[in-house]
Amino acid sequence: INPGSTSTKVSYFENEKNIFTESIFHDAPELLKYPTANDQLPMRRKVLLDFLGKHNIDPGDIDVFIGRGGCAYSQRAGVMVIDERLVEDTARDRGGSDHPAKLGVMLAYDLCKVYGGKMYTVNPTNVDELCDYARPTGIAGLYRRAQTHVLNQKGIAAIHAKKLGKKYEDLNLIVCHVDGGITITAHCKGKMIDSTEGAGGDGPFTPTRLGS
C-alpha cells in the first residue's frame, strides 16, 4: 500500500510473484477537499478496497498487509512491525512533517484489525541514515532532516545492484526519485548518507512543490 502526494499505488503478491499492480491518480481538486493527510484516510481506504474488489480479492484471505510509512520518529531502514504506538506517532506527525505516505501504515493497521493477518512497514520516509556533515545548514541551529523517498530509492538501488551482479551494500550510487515529489540521494555502501529534503521543498521544483 503506497500512498503518494498525487496517487495511491497498490500491489497484490502471492509469495514473490506480483499478481496485480495499479496506480490510482487523484485530481488536485479532489485532494484539496482534505486539509491534512489524515483527512484523506477514508478516501484512500475506499480506493484500496475498490482495488481489491475489482480483482475479486477477499481482504480476509490476505496474510500480510504492508504499508508505506512516514511522519513518525526517525528509524532505521528495513522492515518494522506496525503497532498502536507507531500508528499514534504517525498520525500525530511526530517526525515533523505531514505527508500522505504515512497513510500506508494507518491503512495496513485498519485492514489488519478488521480482516486479520500481519502488518509491516518497509523503509518509510522517516528513515534517517544521514552522515553528520550532511545535517548543518548555513543558519546556526538549523539542521537538515532526513525526509526522502526511501522505499523507492532503496528498491531501485537494489534492483540496479542485482542487474550488475553486485550487492547494494557494496555500491556507491546517486539515485533520483521523480514523481509528485523529487529527491536526489547519495547512497554509500547501503546507507543514504546525503539527500535533498523532499518534504521541505528542497531540491528541484516538482509537480507539487516549489523547490529551492
Per-region residue spans from a language model:
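Short glycine-aspartate micro-motif
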Residues: 1, 62-66, 173-177
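Short, well-ordered amphipathic alpha-helical segments that serve as non-catalytic structural scaffolds
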Residues: 43-55, 156
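Short glycine-rich, Thr/Ser-proximal phosphate-binding strand/loop in the N-terminal lobe
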Residues: 1-39
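A glycine- and small-aliphatic-rich helix-loop capping segment at beta-alpha/alpha-beta transitions
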Residues: 13-18, 78-89, 111, 135-140, ...
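Glycine-rich phosphate-binding loop plus the immediately following alpha-helix
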Residues: 102-110, 121, 128, 136, ...
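Short loop/turn microsegments at loop-to-beta-strand junctions
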Residues: 8, 181-182
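Short beta-strand-loop/turn "lid" adjacent to the catalytic site in phosphate-handling enzymes
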Residues: 52-100, 118, 126-137
